[in-house]
Amino acid sequence: MIQKSRPALLQHQDVGDRVETLMLQPVIKAFLCGSISGTCSTLLFQPLDLLKTRLQTLQPSAHGSRRVGMLALLLNVVRTESPLGLWKGMSPSIVRCVPGVGIYFGTLYSLKQYFLRGHPPTALESIILGAGSRSVAGVCMSPITVIKTRYESGRYGYESVYAALRSICHSEGFRGLFSGLTATLLRDAPFSGIYLMFYSQTKNVVLHRTDQLDAVLVPVVNFSCGIFAGILASLVTQPADVIKTHMQLFPMKFRWIGQSVTLIFKDYGLRGFFQGSVPRALRRTLMAAMAWTVYEEMMAKMGLKS
């Protein structure tokens, strides 16, 4: 009996050793650090994402009527749906952001190790690395992004993530899960590239001019550089975000990017491409700044260079 059980025990130990070895891989550590940082930022800033989606999909106001602002919309959501209504769509957001941010940071770490081999990236290299990493994450998480957008809009009554997947596949086919993917990549890839470029270059300038920076101030510097980079990147990519939202919510009407641009301009004018810019800039800036700050701190604790 003892001799028969030993191979199974040894096999179990081998599997355990493989799992332990895998968890020690730097790329896996980068993925885990990114996932944890994504969880923190998503939980805190989900209300801003919901307000952004609602503002972008408001019906055009009649001539002379007062436009609905972010504060008025926030109060309306709290009044009609309760304060927890601000966290509507939390489940798909977590499902998307946690692995999505992990995939982004894991891919970024791998690309840095392969192409840069330890030297800091130039401005152009930062743009390429950030855009490439975000594109990989965007394609992987596109189905969840579609579901998240529809959850937050309040126009769909999905009972669960599985019910949403089944409904979309039944009514729109598998292709429906990738509605607005091109617009998403046109928004996210430039955002991540521009963000990483501003973030890394700004941080290099600050750290270069400061010979000895107190360790306590390092997260503050990282967060401040993240805020600056996020604001600039958000403004540049706002029109693509509006187009993406309309294509994901109304795929039968907004079928391709050129048509979407024409329809949005016809209904809302040039201002329509910047609807929801305030909550989006706040959310993207704060989320990215927090994600990078938490990520870099965790990577430093693990003895890895981010």
From Swiss-Prot:
* Membrane topology reported for the UniProt record: Multi-pass membrane protein
Coiled coil ranges (UniProt) are: none
What PANTHER family does the record point to?
A: MITOCHONDRIAL GLYCINE TRANSPORTER (PTHR46181:SF3)
The taxonomy runs:
Eukaryota, Metazoa, Chordata, Craniata, Vertebrata
User: What is catalysed by this protein?
Assistant: glycine(in) = glycine(out)
The Solcar repeat boundaries are 25-114, 121-205, 217-301
Subcellular location(s): the record lists:
Mitochondrion inner membrane
**Function noted in UniProt:** Mitochondrial glycine transporter that imports glycine into the mitochondrial matrix. Plays an important role in providing glycine for the first enzymatic step in heme biosynthesis, the condensation of glycine with succinyl-CoA to produce 5-aminolevulinate (ALA) in the mitochondrial matrix. Required during erythropoiesis.
Show the GO cellular component annotation of the record: mitochondrial inner membrane; mitochondrion
- Write out the similarity annotation: Belongs to the mitochondrial carrier (TC 2.A.29) family. SLC25A38 subfamily.
Q: Which residues cross the membrane?
A: 31-56, 89-115, 127-152, 180-203, 221-247, 276-294
- Protein's recorded name: Mitochondrial glycine transporter
**Which GO molecular function entries does the Swiss-Prot or TrEMBL record give?**
glycine transmembrane transporter activity
Q: Which gene encodes it?
A: SLC25A38
Q: Which HAMAP family does its entry note? A: SLC25A38
UniProt entry keywords in alphabetical sequence: Membrane, Mitochondrion, Mitochondrion inner membrane, Repeat, Transmembrane, Transmembrane helix, Transport
SUPFAM superfamilies on file: Mitochondrial carrier
The GO biological-process annotations, alphabetized, read as: erythrocyte differentiation; glycine import into mitochondrion
